């Protein structure tokens, strides 16, 4: 479960960071 969650976080993290901080 955790490895899957970690991989999802690695994929979605940059996109969420981009949306939240407006630094794309």
Swiss-Prot record:
Q: Which family does it belong to?
A: Belongs to the frog skin active peptide (FSAP) family. Brevinin subfamily.
Keyword Secreted part of the UniProt annotation: yes
- Provide an example Pfam family for this protein: Antimicrobial_1
Record protein name field: Brevinin-1BYb
**Cell compartment(s), UniProt:** Secreted
Alphabetically sorted, this entry's keywords are: Amphibian defense peptide, Antibiotic, Antimicrobial, Cytolysis, Disulfide bond, Fungicide, Hemolysis, Secreted
Show the disulfide pairing.
Answer: 18-24
Listed GO biological process terms: defense response to bacterium; defense response to fungus; killing of cells of another organism
Which tissues show it? Expressed by the skin glands.
User: What is any one of the record's Gene Ontology cellular component terms?
Assistant: extracellular region
Q: Which domain of life is it from?
A: Eukaryota
Name the job this protein performs: Antibacterial activity against Gram-positive bacterium S.aureus and Gram-negative bacterium E.coli. Has moderate antifungal activity against C.albicans and strong hemolytic activity.
